[in-house]
Amino acid sequence: MAQGQGFGFGLGKMKELAAAIQKAQQVQEGAKKLQEDLERMDIEGQAAGGAVKVIMSGTQEPRRVEISPDLLSEGAEVLSDLVTAAMRDAYQKSTATMRERMEELTGSLNVPGLG
């Protein structure tokens, strides 16, 4: 074996490996912070012009449901439909927020295949 050839893992490869490890650590730290941020968020979905509201976290954890007293006389089926619509709205907003934040995280790190 000629001098400097070793196992094909020279100084250049070591620098690449160190950079890859550093990026992986950045992704891990960023993902942890993102998870914490998403858990703290309150994202609101609405139906009936805001008469029914569903609030969930950025990780789609339900927090609360608010129903205008004016709707209580509408009956169970109508209320059920409105709550379901508000839940869908909140879920869509929450998943869109999560997706956007993930794209921001991975895009800023320039990790191939993630951004």
Curated annotation (Swiss-Prot):
Species for this entry: Thermosynechococcus vestitus (strain NIES-2133 / IAM M-273 / BP-1)
Cell compartments where the protein resides: Cytoplasm, Nucleoid
Protein name: Nucleoid-associated protein tlr0723
MF term (GO), any: DNA binding
Organism lineage string: Bacteria, Bacillati, Cyanobacteriota, Cyanophyceae, Acaryochloridales
Biological role: Binds to DNA and alters its conformation. May be involved in regulation of gene expression, nucleoid organization and DNA protection.
Keywords of this entry: Cytoplasm, DNA-binding
Pfam families, sorted: YbaB_DNA_bd (PF02575)
Annotated family: Belongs to the YbaB/EbfC family.
Spans through the membrane: none
Main location as per UniProt: cytoplasm
NCBIfam families (UniProt xref): DNA_YbaB_EbfC
GO cellular component, one term: cytosol
Complexes and interactors: Homodimer.
HAMAP family from the UniProt entry: DNA_YbaB_EbfC
InterPro entries, per the entry: YbaB-like_sf, YbaB/EbfC
